[in-house]
Amino acid sequence: MYEGIQSPLSVKSEAYAGRIVKMVQHLHENGNKHFASVYNQVLRSGTSISANIGESLFAQSPADFITKLHIALKEASETRRWLNVLKE
């Protein structure tokens, strides 16, 4: 894909990353300080989804494209697990 052209997945993942950033900021300000390392992990894995989807748009090969999206999927799974930890 070319710069300036975004897929629906790219747009949604960027919006999700923005919500993750806002949520983690709120948790750092108002949440239990003992969970700060978990908040930071949510931030890392949650924003990595969008970063990898963005990288996939400029993949050097079909295999590279698939690899980037697979990494994004794994980061999404990790983020969900950390969010479940915080929910409990």
Model-derived segments and spans:
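Amphipathic alpha-helical assembly/interaction segments
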Residues: M1-E88
